């Protein structure tokens, strides 16, 4: 049985904890949209291409998070002439993945616990920077959908009736498991949800979750929006008393009943809380003040 799960004539995917998109080109090639966490997710891509007798022409990395680019190095090293495409603001972090644990370590050299494959993939050169709203690869035109928010310059890809939405939205089962969707920019994340809700493709594939037909998209978007708003309310409620970022994060964790077992998960959670604090400050709902106890957050108007 083929590893490819067909979606439409020219699209397919390899399902898993990370869904990997495949675009089939008319010249007998293929384009991979994200490659998963590591070589163990890169290998099925290679095997599926071999089974289908197709050559990998390119990888489009939707954003720099390790669970989306970790298979890049394996595929680039083992296959010939594979070009990597990424958005301008994502490319430096794809080429230099140490930057991800650095920013999760407040800009410091990251501790060893944050230098694992969960946060730091192996880097590869990005040959093509995506700046516009469409690109052509191997004779196939792909629409680029701006989906910032989860990361600084995340993109989706639309082709042949399918929108590969990366982490622009999550499947409902993923939301219920993790509680607070990770965000770099909460306002941009909400705007990207609205942008997805307006699209008319027949199918939408999230990076994590089930393939979603157009008829079920509104419900999925609503669940994502509610999860973001729930997190925002929890952060705002945590400001009934002043506190630094870590104190606020502890309050939010308790309020949401989240169990955090590892340092990578904790670093990601604290960064998400910090994104919500920044959003509240920018909208006048929180204040950041320097005190004798350090940088302290307080509720705003």
What are these language model-derived features?
Residues 237-301:
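C-terminal regulatory/interaction regions
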Residues 5, 23, 130-137:
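Short acidic-hydrophobic surface loop/beta-edge motif
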């Amino acid at each position: 049985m083929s590893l490819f799960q067909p979606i439409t004539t020219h699209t397919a995917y390899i399902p898993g904890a990370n869904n990997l998109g495949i675009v089939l080109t008319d010249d007998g090639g293929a384009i991979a949209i994200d490659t998963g966490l590591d070589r163990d997710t890169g290998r099925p891509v290679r095997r599926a291409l071999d089974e289908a007798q197709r050559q990998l022409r390119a990888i489009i990395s939707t954003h720099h998070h390790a669970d989306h680019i970790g298979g890049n190095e394996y595929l680039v090293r083992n296959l010939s002439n594979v070009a990597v495409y990424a958005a301008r603001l994502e490319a430096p972090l794809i080429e230099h993945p140490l930057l991800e644990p650095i920013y999760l370590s407040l800009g410091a050299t990251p501790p060893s616990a944050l230098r694992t494959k969960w946060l730091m993939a192996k880097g590869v050169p990005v040959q093509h920077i995506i700046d516009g709203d469409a690109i052509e690869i191997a004779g196939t035109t792909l629409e680029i959908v701006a989906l910032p928010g989860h990361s600084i310059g995340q993109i989706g890809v639309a082709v042949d009736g399918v929108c590969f939405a990366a982490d622009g939205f999550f499947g409902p089962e993923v939301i219920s498991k993790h509680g607070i969707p990770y965000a770099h920019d909460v306002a941009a994340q909400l705007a990207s949800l609205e942008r997805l809700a307006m699209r008319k493709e027949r199918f939408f594939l999230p990076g994590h979750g089930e393939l979603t037909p157009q008829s079920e998209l509104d419900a999925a978007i609503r669940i994502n929006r509610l999860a973001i708003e729930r997190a925002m309310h929890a952060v705002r409620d945590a400001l009934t008393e002043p506190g630094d970022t870590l104190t606020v994060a502890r309050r939010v964790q308790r309020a949401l009943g989240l169990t955090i077992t590892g340092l990578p998960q904790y670093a990601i959670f604290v960064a998400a809380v910090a994104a919500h604090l920044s959003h509240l400050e920018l909208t006048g709902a929180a204040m950041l003040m320097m005190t004798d106890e350090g940088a302290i957050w307080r509720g705003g108007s």
